């Protein structure tokens, strides 16, 4: 998935916002909660990072082309990073990105979710 495809897909998810941070990463949030990030190029952490359920983390963590996300997974959080498309194609990746968005949205307070739904999506 190219950076353009990644950004276009993430932008299509309701109430998602984009920032560039952490040394040039394309970072996507919903209600201020991170749901996906992409580091491009030759960075040691190059790849697409997304939040997963505990079960998905156990299933995906040792698959070729996937790994526990640096920093996030080392802190006990359930985040996966796709570094190549060996065992997860772009179509599957978009399903996980959508689920990551839903997981982040679910972590918002009721008031935060209401504020998002009562204001127009950016």
Which ranges hold each PLM region?
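Charge-dense, helix-prone N-terminal extensions
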Residues: 1-122
């Amino acid at each position: 998935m190219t950076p353009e495809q990644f950004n276009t897909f993430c932008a299509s998810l309701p109430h998602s916002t984009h920032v560039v941070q952490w040394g040039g990463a394309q970072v996507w949030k919903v209600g201020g909660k991170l749901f996906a990030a992409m580091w491009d190029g030759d960075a040691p952490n190059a790849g697409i990072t997304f939040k997963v359920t505990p079960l998905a983390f156990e299933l995906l963590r040792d698959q070729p082309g996937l790994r526990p996300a640096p920093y996030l997974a080392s802190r006990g959080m359930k985040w996966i990073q796709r570094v190549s498309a060996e065992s997860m194609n772009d179509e599957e990746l978009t399903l996980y990105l959508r689920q990551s968005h839903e997981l982040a949205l679910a972590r918002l307070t009721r008031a935060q979710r209401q504020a998002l739904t009562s204001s127009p999506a950016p």
